[in-house]
């Protein structure tokens, strides 16, 4: 049985520093769509271990940087990750990290 966003009443995102409840259809849909991609779930697992930049994630997952960058934008738009810029050996790096530790879905 496939789960659709219309069947979800509420999503709770729980983190060390903040917790929020999502109950609007548009926001729930954004999160469900972000989690529907196997590639995006792999990225979440990767940065759960350690925050990383696009090139590290792409290398570890054996995917192109362009693809990873596009997927990170979708995860960031859904509010599941945060990104910050840091100086690196070859310029500025965009470091991605999980924003929350848990996602609870209520029906």
Describe each region flagged by the PLM.
Residues 1-32, 87, 94:
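N-terminal leader segment of winged-helix/HTH proteins
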Residues 33-40:
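Short helix-coil-helix linker/hinge
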Residues 41-45:
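Pre-recognition alpha-helix immediately N-terminal to the DNA-recognition helix
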Residues 49-56:
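Short capping segments at the starts of secondary-structure elements
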Residues 59, 76-77:
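Alpha-helical residues within the helix-turn-helix
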Residues 79, 85:
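Glycine-centered, phosphate/nucleic-acid-interacting loop/turn motifs that mediate DNA/RNA or nucleotide
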Residues 88-107:
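Conserved segment of winged-helix/HTH DNA-binding domains
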């Amino acid at each position: 049985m496939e789960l659709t966003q219309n069947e979800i009443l509420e999503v709770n995102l729980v983190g060390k520093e903040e917790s929020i409840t999502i109950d609007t259809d548009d926001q729930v849909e954004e999160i469900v769509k972000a989690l529907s991609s196997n590639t995006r779930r792999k990225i979440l697992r990767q940065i759960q271990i350690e925050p990383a930049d696009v090139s590290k994630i792409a290398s570890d997952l054996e995917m192109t940087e362009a693809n990873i960058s596009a997927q990170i934008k979708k995860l960031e738009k859904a509010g599941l990750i945060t990104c910050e810029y840091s100086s690196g050996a070859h310029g500025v790096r965009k470091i991605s990290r999980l924003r929350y530790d848990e996602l609870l879905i209520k029906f």
